[in-house]
Amino acid sequence: MESSIDGRTVSVKVKLHMGYAYENIRLGLYLLEDGLVYNQINSTPYYPEITRQGVWSDGSVDVIAFGFIHNDVLRHTFSNIFGDVVSGNNVGHDKVYTKEFQYSIPPNMKLENLKLVAFAADYEDRYIINSRESKIGETQDFEPID
């Protein structure tokens, strides 16, 4: 996976190197953001330092974790949520499939908190074959799996 940013436009190239001829393989790419701070309901004993009873804007009362930090928040899907179909001509032992994506990042997202997650999935069995995560601007080589 290779990515670069120009202004607020991110460009990503994802390569899928296959060791097996999957019948129905898909390639997906997500943009995630870390560090989003929002209140949320907390019905667990965790985070007692930020949890107390509170009132929502609609007047309802709840146990709220105030200022909870959300990480790995899905902000954009470059592909179909289940991944884009990799056509039969591109599937097979030792074949490499390449797909390029682009996205204009809205101003409400912090560039330094963004990361990419690419995955290869067997759509029929709903099975993730492999995945990679990287910051924008990083280049990663293939990661073989057995």
Each predicted region: which residue ranges?
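Short, conserved sequence motifs used for protein processing/export or organelle targeting and
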Residues: 1-146
